[in-house]
Amino acid sequence: VKESSIKKKRIAVMMGGLSREREISLKTGKAILKALTEKGYTVTPIDVGEDITEKLVKEKIECAFLALHGRFGEDGTIQGMLELMRIPYTGSGVLASALAMHKIMSKKFFRCEKIPTPRFEVFQREEIKKDLLKKISLPLPVVVKPAREGSTIGVSIVQKDEELGPALKRAGEYDEEILVEEFMKGKEITVGILEDIPLPVIEIVPKSGFYDYHSKYTKGETQYILPARISRERYLYAQEISLKAFQILGCSGVARVDLMTDENENPFVIDVNTMPGMTETSLLPKAASYAGIPFEDLVERILLGASLKMEGGK
C-alpha cells in the first residue's frame, strides 16, 4: 500500500476483543492509535465485540490495523471476516494465524521442516477428566501449556511427579488439547521478524525466574538484554531458524518468534506470535528501536504492509 493512497483512507485500529488478553490488546491499540495519529493518518479505534461487522460498515472502514491478542484476534477468525468484507488488514492471513496460534500444530510443522523445537507430548482434556493419563515419557522438569492461549496463560513448569496432574487440569481449563514440552535449561530469547527480516535478538531475564503474565506486563519485573548474550554463531542461527519458522507457517508482515536455548546455548523455537505486543514494555518495538527503527516508523511500516491475503493479496 502506498503511503499517499492510505493517508486518505479510513483506518480502524481493531483492539480489545473477547479473549483473555483483552487488557493487553487495549494497551497495544492505544499505542498504535497515537503513533498513526501523529503520522497524519485518519484513524478510528474499534473495540472488537459481537457487533464488529456493523461497526466496520458504519465507520466506512477501508483498512484495518489489527491490535488484537489471543482467540478471535490472532487465530485467523477476524482475518477471515476481513477477507470476506474485502478490507485489507495488517499481519498474517487466515491459515498462518490459525497455525501459529495452535502451538501443537505449529510444532508439528517445525518438526517436519527440521526446525529445532523442544520434544513434546499431547494430552486431551477428556483424558484428564477420566484420569486415563498415559505416563509422560519426557524427563522432568516439563512445561505444561494449553494448545491455544498466549501471554503464558495456563502455563506451568512441573518439577515433581505430583505437580503434573494439577498442571494438566489448569491447562485444561483453557483448552481441550494440552501440550507437555521438554523444559529447556538455558536462556529465554526472542526474535522479531519485520517483512522477512530478523531483528536483533533479545534475551529475557525475569526476576521471578519464570516469564509469566505478571513479569511480561509489569515494568521493572523483567530485564531485557540487547543484544542477547550468546555466541555470534548461535545468535545468527537463532535469527535464521526464527525466519524459517515465520516462513514455514506462511506468516506475513510482522511476528515475534520465542525461543529457549539448552545448556549449550543451542536455540530451539517455542512458538510464533503473529500479533506481537506493541506496548511500551513490548519486545518487538525494543528490537526495532535497537535496529534504528523508531516506534512511529515501525507502526507505519506495518500499516503499509496491509493487504488481503487471498486472491493474491490485492
Enumerate the language-model features and the residues they cover.
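Phosphate-binding site of ATP-dependent enzymes
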Residues: Q159-E240, T261-F268
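ATP-binding N-terminal substructure of ATP-dependent carboxylate-amine bond-forming enzymes
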Residues: V1-M101, M105, Q124-L132, L304-G313
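Hydrophobic beta-strand scaffold residues
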Residues: V43, P88-Y89, T117, V142, ...
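Active-site "cap" helix and flanking loop/linker of ATP-utilizing ligase/carboxylase catalytic domains
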Residues: E203-A255, K286-K314
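Conserved metal-phosphate-binding beta-hairpin within the catalytic cores
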Residues: E182, V191, F246-M278, A288
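Glycine-rich phosphate/pyrophosphate-binding beta-alpha loops
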Residues: G70, K207, N273-A287
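Active-site nucleotide/adenylate-binding loops and adjacent lid/helix of ATP-dependent enzymes
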Residues: K2-M15, K58, L99-E181, K185-K187
